[in-house]
Amino acid sequence: MNIGKKLLTAFLIVGILPLAIAGYLALSKSTHALSAQAFNQLSSLREVKKLQIENYFGSRMKMMEDIPKNLRFAGGLQSFTPAFKAGLQSPEYKAILSKRDEGLKIFNDVFGFYDVFLIDVNGNVVYTAAKESDLGTNLVSGPLADSGLAHAFQKSKSGTVFVDFAWYGPSNEAASFIATPLKNKEGVFIGSAAFQVSLKEINAIMQTRAGMGRTGETYLVGPDKLMRSDSFLDPKGHSVK
């Protein structure tokens, strides 16, 4: 290579190299800015969903403070307990059910619960709004003794409790429960009122995808790293089940 070509090559390298470096730095800066923007958006979405979930459960835990004072629960349990002993198909039980059912079911509609339970002091499920297979079972010695509902009943003897999502056979889906103790006029524990949190309500919060595009989604994960809501994009592969 003669000296002219060598000089031309050198000049080209000297001229192109700064442009290449400048282009790389600009691209790197742009990529970093886009990444930072994406992470900031994700952080904002996380905080919004966190607040929505906290408000959802907070309002329901607040509602639980009034349940022991609500006569339809303590009074309902005191009515259902002796009728239950006569049998679910007995005239006594059906009469109480006809009188009390609608007043208890309304809590499903107003607060979005899946089910409402009245449980006597011995752990018998004497009433449910949904009338699934858990109605009539005993939460101490029966097939649901290790279920979330049974744990909620046991823990509620000392106060209002929340039991995390786990598979619940009678509903054929994952369920969590909130329960609170019920007492008679003398202040003696007579059983519990329990409420099954609807998975649909949690999914409705987490699967609202405004501003996420076609591939964005949020879902709830518990401390055990298991799903607490279903994936919107892949509900079969990634779900609470």
Regions found by a protein language model. Give the residues of each.
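Short, conserved clusters of charged catalytic residues that mark active-site
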Residues: 8, 48, 59, 98-102, ...
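Conserved catalytic core of Hanks-type protein kinase domains
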Residues: 67, 155, 221
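Short, flexible loop segments at the rims of nucleotide/cofactor-binding pockets, characterized by
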Residues: 93-95, 141-142
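Intrinsic low-complexity, intrinsically disordered coil/linker regions enriched in small/polar
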Residues: 83-86, 128-144, 158, 184-186, ...
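Juxtamembrane extracytoplasmic/periplasmic/luminal helical "stalk" adjacent to the first N-terminal
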Residues: 5-93, 105-116, 121, 162, ...
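Extracytoplasmic/periplasmic ligand-binding sensor regions of membrane-associated signaling proteins
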Residues: 101-196
